[in-house]
Amino acid sequence: WVHHPFDGDGMIAAFKFENGKINLTNRFVRTKEWAEEEKSQKFLYRGVFGTQKEGGILANAFDVRLKNIANTHVIKLGDDLLALWEASSPYSLNPNTLETNGLSDLKGVLKKGEAFSAHPRFDPGHHQSQRMVTFGVSTGPKSTIRLMEFSTEGENIGSLLSDRKDSFNGFAFLHDFAITPNWAIFLQNAISFNPLPFLLGQKGAAQCLASKSDGAPKFLLIPRDSGKFAGQPPKSVDAPKGFVFHHLNAWEDNEKINIESIFYDDFPSIGPEDNFREIDFDLLPEGILKRSEINPTENTFTCSTISNQCCEFAMVNPHFEGLKARFSWMATAEEKEGNGPLQAIKKIDLSNNEEISWSAAPRGFVSEPIFIPSQESKSEEDNGWVVALVWNSIRS
């Protein structure tokens, strides 16, 4: 077993709607490391979240190779499916067969092994063209964000449209971000990284992260090259306490910026001695959806809670990315309060916080819900379908 589900190899699922039926196809991403381990039938690489090779500390010490597991997200860019993992380059797949073509450098944009976010954002056309906005992070005492925009339409689909780099003081754990027409918004968590246990083979890299109780989280606001602040330096604004993996959406309200994010009281981690199959959820912080209003001019923010129910993997209608959206869909715990496994899918009206839910409990567990808008009625924000994989433990 892997020590943590996040160390698992990427498997892509494809839903095909034909003749009134749904066909499901799924295949592992045939990464170089997957092929090696499949052949040997054992772990040959350490996992970021704590999976170790056989042989104990001596076998793992000073082996700092990262296994590209291509397991976090999948997107379509031109004729390619791209399987993403934020610490390295994407893998290209055939969208029809899901066969693995190999690593992609995106037409020479990425250097070998360069970090490339698993959570790009798709601008629906704020500047008369649809584009993918994404980033890569180089971490250290001083961290650098590379912000990139790619065309997603026309003859130049997949071409790089803009590229800028900005550096910030401190270690940056940036898993996700949000966009508006003029800004790319990051939340730099107050977190530290002690690499020694990783180097000595005692922990995975992510297990060496720890929240800094005396740290000061910051919103990092980077002007988009397609927006009205192009070429200006980034802004740094104080942010709420807590830890954020994922953001829901962001939008501009005159000179202020609103961003909706899922906050944890602390960085949730599974230690070397823990077993993820026997986790006591009451001992782990839950994700709570909150809204922050940022005033870049005055370097201030306000923060309010949208829902107290434990949730993750929230999204809006893709046509409203970067705009004020009314509806959101997300995975939640079954109970209304407290932590727990994700067993339900919730739709929330962000204008009044009204909610409706569908539950797979007690023996069903949901994956990330995807909202697919109807092509027939784009004006109705919540007209579409919600697609998700559900694990039925009764049948497994």
Set out the residue ranges of the language-model regions:
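Beta-propeller domains
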Residues: 1-396
